[in-house]
UniProtKB/Swiss-Prot annotation:
A GO MF term: small ribosomal subunit rRNA binding
Organism name: Rhodopirellula baltica (strain DSM 10527 / NCIMB 13988 / SH1)
Protein name: Small ribosomal subunit protein bS18
Matches recorded under Pfam families: Ribosomal_S18
Sequence ranges of Basic residues compositional bias: 1-19
Amino acid sequence: MSTRSRARKRSRVRSRTRRKDPIFVDGHRPRPMYVDYKDLELLSKMVNRQGRIMGRRKSGCTAASQHAVTAAIKRARFMALLPYVGE
């Protein structure tokens, strides 16, 4: 393998694009992180058809916002605003 092909392989490394958090797309995150448990439109997007909370990889949330979403979904379920089981 020549030096040229090694240099070419190194230059092909892709830069990672930062994904925007789907919960706070306007760029302003409230501190402390809080998601309203009465916002059923947002919470229903974070729950799959079976009623399970989607993971971070699938939802695209950061760790802090995923934790806030999980807490809000659990509160909404306790208040009977969201079902525990899906369809």
